[in-house]
Amino acid sequence: ARNKREGCTRCLDLCPTGAITPGIGPLKDQVLISAEICAGCGACAAVCPTGAATYALPPTQALLRRLRRLLLTYAEAGGAAPVVLFHDETHGEALIEALARHGDGLPARVLPLRVNEVSSLDLAVFAGAFAWGAAAVRLLAPAKRGHGVDGVLRNIDYAEAVLAGLGLAGPAPRAALLETDDPFSLGEALAALPRMAFGFAPARFEALGSPREMAQQGFRALREAASARVVVVALPEKAPFGLARVEQSGCTLCLACTSVCPTSAFTANPDQPELRFLEDSCVQCGLCAATCPEKVITLEPRLNFAPEAAAPQVVKAEEPAACPRCNKLFGTKASIARVKAKLSAHWMFADPARQALLDLCEDCRVLEATNGGIDPYAGAARPVTKTTEDYLREAERAKRGES
């Protein structure tokens, strides 16, 4: 960030070729993607919580439309417990063709869907697949794991955590990565999958909105259909959803968090000292916690299905501080008390008259300092210089037992 605090580094941490670098100079609050170095794995798009990095081959919304039509058509034709198999062209398609030519082919309920890179699948794809009726999702990858799959493995963990929290976990993982170069091993793994149907009708919502909005909509549809009415589901670290918890007793309403939040999850009330938080917009980047001067913000990755998560909630509100001279409203009482406590040990504010200046607004403070004869450049009072006679006099008094 521009304040030299570190926030979200998901794409920087996962890029296998180092194509993503933090900006410098005028671009220091951005990240730079070098098209010449990028290998096209899509790991950055898979984990980006804001949609700043997206994969265009195909776009997520186009992929979700294909996925929705595939699953709903299968359900309308009488199919049950479908398994979606995502694969690429170079490795996956050849493996499926070999299985069809030399073996029994894919099981009837396995629906293959080709993508450019399986490592580019973001969380919205998993949420949409399960909401639209998929009983399981499998990603086909080479046996020798590539460097770009760490991002999609995170999304698999997040999807599994949500399903487990909603009581929808199956006897086998519903989302997993199949790493094999053997077509017969692929066929055996898919045939061995148990039929893990959810037991409720697939959702019918359209694939509209950003990937983040689609992920939230998909998980909400699953929660509405699930028998367990869970409100909050805990998620692993670095999940794209969560709460930024503020310790109210230590918050001074300085509003530093509102100026750095990239998604406006933290906002201020322009009419009075008030801090608001919108949980659905929080991407757990950590900039607020790193910037908070009081260190009272902590991150809690979770998925909150309560209606309050979709509306700004008041985190803390205080009465504004009024200038005792002109009654102008400025700052908050807590922030002024905090400043006075920090400056109480400073020599410039040892005098109570100096401390009283902090209770005034910016205009009255200048007038009081000018009319009161306060010299802002005056140093602390110098101690009286002690001479040799002073030391000898003290020694004589000590001999006589005088204090």
Regions found by a protein language model. Name each.
Residues 1-7, 36-133, 140, 294-403:
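Flanking helices and flexible, charged tails adjoining ferredoxin-like Fe-S electron-transfer domains
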Residues 1-14, 18, 81-94, 149-151, ...:
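Ferredoxin-type iron-sulfur electron-transfer modules and their immediate structural context
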Residues 6-12, 17-41, 50-51:
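Beta-propeller domains
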Residues 32-33, 276-278:
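Accessory beta->alpha helical hairpin/"wing" motif in late/C-terminal subdomains of nucleic-acid enzymes
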Residues 42, 255, 285-286:
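Short tyrosine-centred short linear motifs in exposed loops/low-complexity segments
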Residues 115-116, 142-143, 249, 280:
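Short strand-loop junctions, especially beta-strand C-caps/beta-turns
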Residues 125-182:
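Cofactor-cradling patches in redox/metallo enzymes
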